[in-house]
């Protein structure tokens, strides 16, 4: 048997090894915080390629993203990648919610690393995200939002989670993997009238979707319940011991990309935000559709928001407003590029390249294009020869 002294020595050795690893981690260079985004194109500027969107006319003012606060509920296969992308994009504030721990079984997905096994997902994610971009304010919440006590904490967190702590978050992103948590987010956002995105990946890992929900304007998650609720099935009975859902990092990465792309469009007001966008990996199919709210929805706050929306004066939609002609992004035409019609015949240059005073000469002469006449008399010669004479000539050949 191992003696107490040997066990103490092993513990001391492990403590020394842990201290050494922490010291090496601390020596890793971390950049200083940046107070203002710059478009300067230098290797040391982490925002130069993001600010290029503004220079190219895609976004009016990209730095507005630093004034946005986003809540990410669920830091798993989709949520962790979503938080990673938003951090790299420079969002002002991220609020993470999850109560699970990192496991080695999660290593088939993106973001987490084996050395983080055993840590809470929100704490492990916060450390990595702070290292990626120290400019982002990251707050963690390690609890299950579906319990009565934690639901109130969740409501308060998103109600006061604005960039300055006085208002609500700008957007809530649902990246959870169960119906109960989705319904909790739906109830909270309907009550607080907060816009949010729902996302998910199928159990066979070859399809996924995102859904944009505006309380009162678009269908909430309770307006069109999935099969497990429509047939009154207890979701917990669907899980069997020793059986787990499939998981592909590719599908989760694609769904996270769709989610963050539409999040950026919503926050920075460019492009068109998709109401519902699906993904089928088997045939690379991306279906889109609009979802209207259900007037008889079981969520009373959803019905209340519908009534409030119906009472608002109707505004012209983006499609109905005639867009003013925008000035070209690049007014200068340095290279003399011109658009030519496909049916237009190019005219020959007035000055041959070989005779132009440019020091150039033709490598070969362009053949003169033959002009084709459409008249049948130019192709067939009419000699007034009878058919019998032609037959005789053919036999004689």
From Swiss-Prot:
Disulfide bonds: none annotated. Coiled coil: none annotated. InterPro entries: D-isomer_DH_CS1 (IPR029752), ThiF/MoeB/HesA (IPR045886), ThiF_NAD_FAD-bd (IPR000594), Ubiquitin-activating_enz (IPR035985). GO terms for molecular function: ATP binding; metal ion binding; UFM1 activating enzyme activity. ATP binds at residues 77, 98, 121, 144, 178. Zn(2+) binds at residues 220, 223, 297, 302. This is Ubiquitin-like modifier-activating enzyme 5. It comes from Culex quinquefasciatus.
């Amino acid at each position: 048997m191992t003696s107490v002294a040997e066990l103490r020595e092993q513990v001391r050795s492990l403590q020394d090894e842990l201290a050494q690893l922490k010291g090496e981690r601390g020596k890793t260079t971390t950049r200083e915080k940046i107070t203002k985004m710059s478009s300067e194109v230098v290797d040391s500027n982490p925002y130069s390629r993001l600010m290029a969107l503004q220079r190219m006319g895609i976004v009016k003012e990209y730095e507005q993203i630093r004034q946005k606060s986003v809540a990410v509920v669920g830091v798993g296969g989709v949520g962790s990648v979503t938080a990673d992308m938003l951090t790299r994009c420079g969002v002002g504030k991220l609020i993470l919610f999850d109560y699970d721990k990192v496991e080695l079984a999660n290593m088939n997905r993106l973001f987490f690393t084996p050395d983080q096994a055993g840590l809470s997902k929100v704490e492990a994610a916060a450390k990595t995200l702070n290292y990626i971009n120290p400019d982002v304010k990251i707050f963690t919440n390690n609890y299950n939002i579906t319990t009565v006590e934690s639901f109130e904490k969740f409501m308060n967190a998103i109600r006061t989670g604005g960039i300055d702590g006085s208002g609500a978050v700008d957007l809530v992103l649902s990246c959870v993997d169960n119906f109960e948590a989705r319904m909790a987010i739906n109830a909270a956002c309907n009550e607080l009238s907060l816009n949010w995105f729902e996302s998910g990946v199928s159990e066979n890992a070859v399809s996924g979707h995102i859904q944009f929900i505006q309380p009162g304007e678009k269908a909430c998650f309770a307006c069109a319940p999935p099969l497990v609720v429509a047939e009154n099935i207890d979701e917990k009975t669907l899980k069997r011991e020793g059986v787990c859902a499939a998981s592909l990092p590719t599908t989760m990465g694609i769904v996270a990309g769709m989610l963050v792309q539409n999040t950026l469009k919503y926050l920075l007001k460019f492009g068109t935000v998709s109401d519902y966008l699906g993904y089928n990996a088997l045939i690379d199919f991306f279906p889109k559709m609009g979802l209207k709210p259900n007037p008889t929805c079981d969520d009373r706050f959803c019905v209340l928001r519908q009534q409030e929306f119906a009472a608002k004066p109707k505004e012209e939609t983006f499609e109905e407003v005639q867009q003013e002609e925008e000035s070209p992004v690049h007014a200068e035409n340095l290279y003399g590029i011109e658009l030519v019609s496909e049916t237009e015949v190019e005219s020959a240059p007035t000055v041959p390249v070989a005779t132009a005073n440019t020091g150039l000469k033709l490598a070969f002469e362009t053949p003169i294009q033959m002009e084709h006449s459409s008249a049948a008399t130019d192709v067939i010669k009419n000699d007034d020869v009878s058919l019998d004479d032609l037959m005789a000539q053919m036999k004689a050949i």
